[in-house]
Amino acid sequence: MGRAWGLLVGLLGVVWLLRLGHGEERRPETAAQRCFCQVSGYLDDCTCDVETIDKFNNYRLFPRLQKLLESDYFRYYKVNLKKPCPFWNDINQCGRRDCAVKPCHSDEVPDGIKSASYKYSEEANRIEECEQAERLGAVDESLSEETQKAVLQWTKHDDSSDSFCEIDDIQSPDAEYVDLLLNPERYTGYKGPDAWRIWSVIYEENCFKPQTIQRPLASGRGKSKENTFYNWLEGLCVEKRAFYRLISGLHASINVHLSARYLLQDTWLEKKWGHNVTEFQQRFDGILTEGEGPRRLRNLYFLYLIELRALSKVLPFFERPDFQLFTGNKVQDAENKALLLEILHEIKSFPLHFDENSFFAGDKNEAHKLKEDFRLHFRNISRIMDCVGCFKCRLWGKLQTQGLGTALKILFSEKLIANMPESGPSYEFQLTRQEIVSLFNAFGRISTSVRELENFRHLLQNVH
């Protein structure tokens, strides 16, 4: 036995020396390399690279953004989680504890936020809200003519066909305030056929894809023809290609969060949440996902650039003296607006912004139709969020789709923003409080995803 073992070791040594002599000795590939080897350099359809985004986000933006999102104005979000699914009836509700959402008690939400979720100032919040949609024109006669006109214009705009999302009726008895800090986005155990169906309907019916083209790794479809799919994708116009990449990037961002805040330990004493590298590998490893994982991560960076560009464009709206992050606490409101403007000016200084002028730049009639298709497809995706069986997943799905929809609304409203008056009501361009809260929280999710990728790079360095 000893002689045989010695012979085996000797043979292995000879093989190693031969490989070394031929220059073939290589260190084993790490999991970090398999997940991130393609997540570098310049992004498709952009002039920006991954490394610039990492440095800007992780060291200049992320810490300040997290501080802003912890403030009262941004942590409370009103949402209706009881809306029925408009597409199918057989929703299997997740019964796990971690799928549940704990709404706020009435006395937990600042009065300034509860009084009117779409108004920005103390003066505007004195306006009595109408009890029913049919009575929105019945404005308090004690208000000035200018204010009455502003309220009617806001309502008209908020109900207009320019919206990229199906907006919840926040006056509905089923709409409740949720503290986002107490209901964080993390792994809930919601998976399987129901979760697959949500994403399948989003990709198959809302991303401009014909049924004859099969998505890579599509559930239940057998082995995909990857080259066929990407040849089709590259043949699309830039707008439709961008649409797919935005949805893929959002999907990737959600999966990063589920891997970064995974339930590692669940006992009667405590729950321990943290990074699950195995879960991350299953979702993004280049070998395990047949090359799809790294592509999805690149799409996450593309999504980051789109929302970053929208925030840079909307700066004039927030700079107006009349705008406040109104909660009723004057000192805190002033500090939060100062921090908000500091963040937006930092974003404005980003050197490699996405150029949205390439969107809808052709024939006017064709561009108008394409923009409308773009809007309707995204609006439909926002409706699909009401079909998610996990309430916590539904909460964050609705918030993030509304946030991305708001970003798209901003990008396609550049002229309206440029023509806003420096003071007084803005009739042409308006953002509700719901849109503002979802916009910044959605970008906060993507910013956190980019930050978490750095953590996973380090954690996977020594994993093979």
Curated annotation (Swiss-Prot):
Tissues showing expression: Widely expressed (at protein level). In the mammary gland, expressed at higher levels in lactating mice than in virgin mice (at protein level).
GO MF terms, alphabetically ordered: FAD binding; oxidoreductase activity; protein-disulfide reductase activity; thiol oxidase activity
Record has Membrane as a keyword: yes
Cell compartments where the protein resides: Endoplasmic reticulum membrane; Golgi apparatus lumen; Secreted; Cell projection, Dendrite
A cellular component annotation (GO) from this entry: endoplasmic reticulum
Main localization (coarse): endoplasmic reticulum
Reported induction: Stimulated by hypoxia; suggesting that it is regulated via the HIF-pathway. By ER stress in a DDIT3/CHOP-dependent manner.
Residues annotated as binding FAD: R186, T188, W199, S248, H251, R283, R296
A Gene Ontology BP annotation from the UniProt entry: skeletal muscle tissue development
Regulation: Enzyme activity is tightly regulated to prevent the accumulation of reactive oxygen species in the endoplasmic reticulum. Reversibly down-regulated by the formation of disulfide bonds between the active site Cys-94 and Cys-130, and between Cys-99 and Cys-104. Glutathione may be required to regulate its activity in the endoplasmic reticulum.
Keywords of the record: Apoptosis, Cell projection, Disulfide bond, Electron transport, Endoplasmic reticulum, FAD, Flavoprotein, Glycoprotein, Golgi apparatus, Membrane, Oxidoreductase, Phosphoprotein, Redox-active center, Secreted, Signal, Transport
Cross-referenced Pfam families: ERO1 (PF04137)
Glycan attachment positions: N276, N380
Self-association state and partner proteins as the record states: Predominantly monomer. May function both as a monomer and a homodimer. Interacts with PDILT. Interacts with ERP44; the interaction results in retention of ERO1A in the endoplasmic reticulum.
Protein known as: ERO1-like protein alpha
Name of the gene this protein is made from: Ero1a
